[in-house]
């Protein structure tokens, strides 16, 4: 069904409700406004495959990774963020596809881990950046993963820093609800081995989860979908018991095809997981991390930087060795 026809049908179906109270700005369902997910033609895997057509690994990387819909990450490297986010959302919209975007620029990013340290120069700089991010997407349908690791990275932070971070996330949700009404925003909730369900439920709630569409799990990690689903349900049980609501969640399945070996930073022998789809035990299973992109200078990516595409790692991940 074409985008225009779906939009017209939705409008016609809504006519009997014309005098009902307006739904909240973030209530639109972008999955019904599009026809499948957007595969980024300029992902690191796509660029490598295009630049190395004679490499014996290129065909497999192109077929199994580059052509799979996955997220594009946005941060300080993205230039004018409103323009960058708008161009990406617009390209997907032009193909009637749903894009997945990751906002990864919070002030004091990866403060305790360090492998991906950086982010905006100050809380006010981040507020401006995230407002422009949301404004760039505008009314186009999109999925946004909001600041991976931001609620798990508390181990070395003092209470004032935690309050500051939660305030930045709450403000980000306000911006998306005001400016991007057809975007589903998922606050990142780390992974099942980072914080217990009760702790994560509290952190999510205090950072404004009620204003978000849901939360994300396992971003850039390797833990099985089953373990993440059990954890997501446990977080929701805590949310229901403590605060009276639950939220849908998504799981990053890009690199969890054979689970975790206990290491999180470029472990060997990992395998790609279920390609991006709706359902599957969560609201969506998404490729949020690009398989083959380094976690940092560690493991089988020794000597690399976070985000660098490593073709040999990508190739081996297709087959799990």
Curated annotation (Swiss-Prot):
Pfam families: Glyco_hydro_6. Disulfide bonds join 112-156. It is an enzyme of class 3 (hydrolase). The keyword Oxidoreductase does not apply. The active site is at residues 110, 149, 295. InterPro entries: Beta_cellobiohydrolase, Beta_cellobiohydrolase_sf, Glyco_hydro_6_CS. GO terms for biological process: cellulose catabolic process. The keyword Disulfide bond applies. Implicated in the mechanism of induction exerted by cellobiose. Belongs to the glycosyl hydrolase 6 (cellulase B) family. This is Endoglucanase 1. It comes from Streptomyces halstedii. The gene is celA1.
């Amino acid at each position: 069904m074409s985008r225009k026809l779906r939009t017209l049908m939705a409008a016609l179906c809504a006519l009997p409700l014309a005098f009902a109270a307006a739904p909240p700005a973030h209530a639109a369902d972008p999955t019904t406004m599009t026809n499948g997910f957007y595969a980024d033609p300029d992902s690191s895997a796509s660029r490598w495959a295009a630049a190395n057509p004679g490499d014996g690994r290129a065909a497999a990387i192109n077929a199994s990774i580059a052509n799979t819909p996955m997220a594009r990450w946005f941060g300080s490297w993205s230039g004018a963020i409103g323009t960058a986010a708008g161009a990406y959302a617009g390209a997907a919209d032009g193909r009637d596809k749903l894009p997945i975007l990751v906002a990864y620029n919070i002030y004091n990013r990866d403060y305790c881990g360090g492998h991906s340290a950086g982010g905006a120069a100050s809380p006010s700089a981040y507020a401006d950046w995230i407002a422009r991010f949301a404004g760039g997407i505008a009314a186009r349908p999109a999925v946004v993963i909001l600041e991976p690791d931001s609620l798990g990275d508390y181990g070395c932070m003092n209470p004032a820093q935690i309050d500051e971070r939660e305030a930045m996330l709450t403000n980000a949700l306000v911006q998306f609800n005001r400016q991007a009404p057809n975007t589903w925003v998922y606050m990142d909730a780390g992974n099942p081995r980072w914080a217990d369900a009760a702790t994560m439920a509290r952190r999510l709630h205090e950072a404004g989860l009620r204003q978000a569409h849901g939360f994300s799990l396992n971003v850039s990690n390797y833990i099985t979908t089953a373990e993440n689903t059990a954890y997501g349900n446990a977080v929701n049980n805590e949310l229901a018991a403590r605060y009276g609501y639950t939220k849908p969640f998504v799981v990053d399945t890009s690199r969890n095809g054979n689970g975790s070996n206990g290491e999180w930073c470029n472990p060997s022998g990992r395998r790609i997981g279920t390609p991006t789809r709706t359902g599957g035990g969560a609201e969506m299973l998404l490729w949020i991390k690009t398989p083959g992109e380094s976690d940092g200078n560690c493991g089988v990516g020794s000597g690399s930087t976070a985000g660098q595409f490593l073709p040999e790692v990508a190739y081996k991940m297709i087959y799990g060795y």
